[in-house]
A protein has these predicted regions:
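Helical scaffold of the NTase/Pol beta-like nucleotidyltransferase catalytic core
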Residues: 29-60, 90-96, 100, 295
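Catalytic metal-binding acidic patch
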Residues: 60-101, 113-121
Length: 295
């Protein structure tokens, strides 16, 4: 599941965030490669959103692997949904419950896992950190949702990363382009969000069952702090493999290959190597953050 929510910046001096519009030809090729099943799944999700949200629905954007790099075997379909006003408890519960039948993990021939992030437009414009997230649906919540437990709206640092991704590479399925709908995320807030994401992983209980995603998320955070680029997981892994000490490379190589569907995920069976890589990556990320703060 996609848990690092993905700033094109120039460094080291005069750093700024640059928004880019997606390359239409590349986007269309990615969508064609992703297939008709994905398009049908997205269409069904849009129908469901219209049904539950009605006139409150302001915009829907497709972003992530589906429009940038292509979906991999375990990739989510990422949807960013924007509404005008907060949801009632009844609509929140009904929408989350109905999304369960439009999503699957593991992926099937007809359904991929959905990740739906819903926000109230006024909660993120004008921009402030940490922004409020109105709702989030993902397969990691399936057991909780089926048990009748629904998350309320909450502050979420991850929205800084997510909105930066969407402003750069997203397809508007409804409403204006993301670069018009949302303000740029200041560099300081982006760096803060990346650091806060890495700081979540302190011990084995924090990455249990999600080892591959955590390793690749750290590679992406490291790349972004070093170069200002937002890259796909496999691209970030390739970049970092050229810079890692030899003892940490096998673990990252495996995580990349698992993501690409080319290897079996055995990272949980390598606890010492896993903890060593995560500790090393977090120290380097903290160093890069300190260097940014001192410039």
């Amino acid at each position: 599941m996609e848990r690092y929510r993905r700033i094109d910046q120039t460094r080291p001096s005069g750093t700024r965030i640059c928004e880019t519009r997606p390359n239409g030809g590349k986007v269309q090729r990615n969508l064609k490669r992703n297939g008709e099943n994905m398009n049908l799944q997205i269409s069904n999700a849009l129908t469901l959103l219209h049904h539950h949200l009605g006139d409150n629905l302001l915009a829907v954007h497709l972003f992530g692997s589906a429009v940038s790099g292509g979906l991999k075997p375990a990739s989510d379909i990422d949807l960013l949904v924007t509404v005008r006003t907060p949801l009632s408890d009844s609509i929140r519960k009904a929408l989350m419950t109905d999304l369960l039948r439009l999503s699957a993990w593991p992926a099937t021939a007809h359904l991929r896992p959905l990740e739906v992030t819903l926000l109230v437009h006024d909660a993120v414009r004008p921009w402030r950190y940490r922004p409020m997230r109105e709702l989030q649906f993902g397969e990691w919540l399936r057991d909780e949702l089926q048990a009748g437990r629904f998350e309320p709206a909450m502050a979420d640092h991850d929205l800084a990363i997510l909105l930066s991704k969407a402003r750069q590479h997203a397809i508007s399925l409804l409403g204006p382009p993301a670069a018009e709908l949302f303000e740029p995320v200041p560099e300081a807030d982006m760096i803060h969000a990346l650091h806060d994401t890495a700081a979540q992983w302190n011990g084995p209980d924090d990455w249990l069952g999600d080892e591959c995603n955590v390793v690749l998320a750290l590679a992406r955070i490291w790349l972004t702090l070093s170069s200002g680029e937002i890259a796909a997981k496999d691209v970030a892994a390739d970049w970092l493999l050229e810079r890692l000490p030899p003892e940490h490379r096998p673990l990252l190589e495996t995580a990349r290959d698992v993501y690409l569907g080319q290897a079996r995920d055995d990272l949980a069976q390598r606890p010492q190597a896993l903890a060593a890589f995560i500790g090393y990556a977090r120290r380097q990320i903290e160093r890069l953050r300190s260097e940014s703060a001192n410039r």
